[in-house]
């Protein structure tokens, strides 16, 4: 029987999921996105050729793989078409490989307008959203006024529903945020223009995945963002609007949770965060600059500079707990090359002197803590491009071993560069 594997980020996103998903899809029949939207940025480098995907699953470059956008994903039709056209220009037969759930909530222009208006109104308290309408679209879903992909297939009903929801949101835009209203007729025309095209790719995702499971076909579920950005378990309110954790697989695709066999947590050898929010191990010094520059730490979606810091084992333990992580993939180990010493956060010290080894439940708690750091010797040798454990310096191996001890979870894959070939698979999640 084929295995069903989840690949997700265990930090604040940008861990290197796209490369690992692409690598593992060699053994998968289906690759499924189950949450988020085009706020995610997954970078693939194959033989030096770089591809950045935001909405379409990373397996789209494989000719033996069907890619699925599940119901938990909020879908922006214009962003999807931009991505499809980019891939088609490169010779990728997207229509043959991509399937979409009719239950995906739609992101429409008024969602983006609201997102931008709210961030502007927050001023210095801005959350740091991508401004792409993700949050407002999820709000409409939960409020049961949202429009879904399937609504596009009845033009008359769609027009009625759209008019109702736009009256509500345009009132907020003009009267509360003092912004321009979004044009109803233009929004309607643009949405209906691609209805038939989207319909040709729609399917019953839950049924398809269940039949695939019964047939023994391996399925890979691709997470976006990271555990610490989860709407329920992240550094609230500095979080995304979806469930980025393993639990989101079932709700965002309709796949039964008992059928998940392996959860691969992607963990960078250090930590980064983009946008606002607490970050106990953040390095605002020359070492932070070194990590940011060497690691090319700029967001794939927004281009924003990421904030670097030491690896936070306290937060990673929470990620292991929430996701039932089976094993880790350690990425960007090579970025630590050349440092005299490397540090790991093993506890949080509060102002009264007490030390905790578990994370707070909200952003305010994180703001109070100081990281308790364990120092280990660094290494001068390069790990870049290493393809076997024997090629790694002893100090790097000691660092990996210490992480496994602290997390009580094996590191099954090690990534030492951006190309899919620069990877060591010690234990294959599909084996």
From Swiss-Prot:
Cofactor mode of binding and number, as noted: Binds 1 Mg(2+) ion per subunit.
GO biological process: 'de novo' AMP biosynthetic process; IMP metabolic process
Binding sites annotated in the UniProt record for IMP: 14-17, 39-42, 130, 144, 225, 240, 304
Catalytic function, reaction form: IMP + L-aspartate + GTP = N(6)-(1,2-dicarboxyethyl)-AMP + GDP + phosphate + 2 H(+)
UniProt GO cellular component terms: cytoplasm
SMART domains per the UniProt record, alphabetical: Adenylsucc_synt
Residues given in the record as substrate binding sites: 300-306
Record localization: Cytoplasm
Keywords per UniProt: Cytoplasm, GTP-binding, Ligase, Magnesium, Metal-binding, Nucleotide-binding, Purine biosynthesis
Record: residues binding Mg(2+): 14, 41
Class of this enzyme: ligase
Binding-site residues, GTP: 13-19, 41-43, 306, 332-334, 415-417
MF terms (GO), sorted A to Z: adenylosuccinate synthase activity; GTP binding; magnesium ion binding
Cofactor(s) for this UniProt protein: Mg(2+)
Job of this protein: Plays an important role in the de novo pathway of purine nucleotide biosynthesis. Catalyzes the first committed step in the biosynthesis of AMP from IMP.
Family: Belongs to the adenylosuccinate synthetase family.
Record note on quaternary structure: Homodimer.
Protein name: Adenylosuccinate synthetase
């Amino acid at each position: 029987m084929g295995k069903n594997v989840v690949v997700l980020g265990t930090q604040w996103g940008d861990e290197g999921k796209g490369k690992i998903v692409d690598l593992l899809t060699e053994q998968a029949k289906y690759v499924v996105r189950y949450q988020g939207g085009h706020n995610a940025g997954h970078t693939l480098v194959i033989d030096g050729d770089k591809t950045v995907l935001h909405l379409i699953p990373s397996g789209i470059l494989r000719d033996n793989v069907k890619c699925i956008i599940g119901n938990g994903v909020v879908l922006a039709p214009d962003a999807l078409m931009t991505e499809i056209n980019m891939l088609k220009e490169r010779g990728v037969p997207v229509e043959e490989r991509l399937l979409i759930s009719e239950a995906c909530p739609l992101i429409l222009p008024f969602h983006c307008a609201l997102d931008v208006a709210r961030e502007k109104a927050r001023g210095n308290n801005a959350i740091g959203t991508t401004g792409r309408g993700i949050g407002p679209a999820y709000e409409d879903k939960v409020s049961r006024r949202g429009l879904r992909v399937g609504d596009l297939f009845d033009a008359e009903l769609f027009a009625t529903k759209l008019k109702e929801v736009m009256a509500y949101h345009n009132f907020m835009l003009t009267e509360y945020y003092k912004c321009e209203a979004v044009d109803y007729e233009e929004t309607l025309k643009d949405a209906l223009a691609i209805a038939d095209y989207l319909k040709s790719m729609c399917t019953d995702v839950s049924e398809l995945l269940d039949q695939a499971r019964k047939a023994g076909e391996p399925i890979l579920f691709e997470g976006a963002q990271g555990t610490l950005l989860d709407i329920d378990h992240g550094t609230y309110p500095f979080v995304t609007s979806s469930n980025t954790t393993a639990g989101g697989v079932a709700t965002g695709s309709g796949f039964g949770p008992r059928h998940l066999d392996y959860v691969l947590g992607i963990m960078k050898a250090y930590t980064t965060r983009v946008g606002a929010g607490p970050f106990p191990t953040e390095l605002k010094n020359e070492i932070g600059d070194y990590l940011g520059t060497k690691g090319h730490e700029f967001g794939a979606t927004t281009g924003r500079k990421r904030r670097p810091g030491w690896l936070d084992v306290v937060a990673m333990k929470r990620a292991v707990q929430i996701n039932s992580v089976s094993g880790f993939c350690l990425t960007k180990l090579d970025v630590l090359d050349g440092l005299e010493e490397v540090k790991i956060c093993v506890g949080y010290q509060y102002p009264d002197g007490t030390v905790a080894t578990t994370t707070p439940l909200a952003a305010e708690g994180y703001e109070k803590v100081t990281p308790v750091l364990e120092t280990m010797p660094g290494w001068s040798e390069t790990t870049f491009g290493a393809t076997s454990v024997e090629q790694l310096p002893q100090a790097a191996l000691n660092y990996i071993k210490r992480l496994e001890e602290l997390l009580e979870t094996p590191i099954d894959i090690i990534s030492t560069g951006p190309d899919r070939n620069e990877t060591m698979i010690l234990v294959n999640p599909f084996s």
